[in-house]
C-alpha cells in the first residue's frame, strides 16, 4: 500500500523493492507488463546470477523465448558473457522502463574464481560498450535464506 511505502521511505535511507521476479532462475527477460517501477523509484538494479553462464537459455532464463528473441539467438544457445551483458543492457531487457533513473547491474553467484573471471568479462562489456557500472556479490552457504 502507498501509505506503508511512504512510511518506509521516511524511516530508511534506502528502500529496495523487487519490481519483477525470475521464478528462482538466474536470469530473465521481462514480460510486456514488467517491470513495475513505482514513480518514487530513482535507481534500478538489474540482477543476474553467474550460474546462468555456459548453459542453454531455455534452462537458465525465465521467459527464455523472450530472451532468445531479444538476443536473436535460439533458445538452446548457451548464455555467454556477451549475451548476458546484452540482455542486461537492453532497453527491452534489464534496462526496460528505466528512463532517466540511475541504472546499475549486480552480478550475483560469483562463488568461484572461474565465475569471478566471467563476471569481469560481463562487467567489462557493460562498461566499455554500454557505460553501465556493475557490482558483483555472493553469499556463503550459511547466509542464504
PLM region descriptions:
Residues 1-11, 20-129:
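Conserved catalytic-core segment of NTP-binding enzymes
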Amino acid at each position: 500500500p502507498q501509505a506503508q511505502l511512504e512510511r518506509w521511505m521516511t524511516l530508511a535511507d534506502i528502500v529496495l523493492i523487487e519490481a519483477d521476479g525470475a521464478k528462482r532462475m538466474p536470469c530473465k527477460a521481462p514480460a510486456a507488463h514488467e517491470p513495475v517501477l513505482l514513480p518514487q523509484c530513482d535507481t534500478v538494479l538489474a540482477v543476474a546470477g553467474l550460474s546462468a553462464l555456459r548453459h542453454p537459455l531455455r534452462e537458465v532464463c525465465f521467459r527464455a523465448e523472450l530472451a532468445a528473441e531479444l538476443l536473436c539467438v535460439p533458445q538452446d544457445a548457451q548464455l555467454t558473457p556477451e549475451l548476458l551483458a546484452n540482455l542486461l543492457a537492453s532497453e527491452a531487457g534489464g534496462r526496460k522502463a528505466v528512463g532517466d533513473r540511475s541504472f546499475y547491474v549486480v552480478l550475483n553467484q560469483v562463488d568461484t574464481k572461474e565465475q569471478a573471471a566471467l563476471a569481469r568479462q560481463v562487467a567489462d562489456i557493460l562498461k566499455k560498450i554500454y557505460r553501465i557500472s556493475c557490482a558483483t556479490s555472493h553469499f556463503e552457504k550459511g547466509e542464504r535464506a
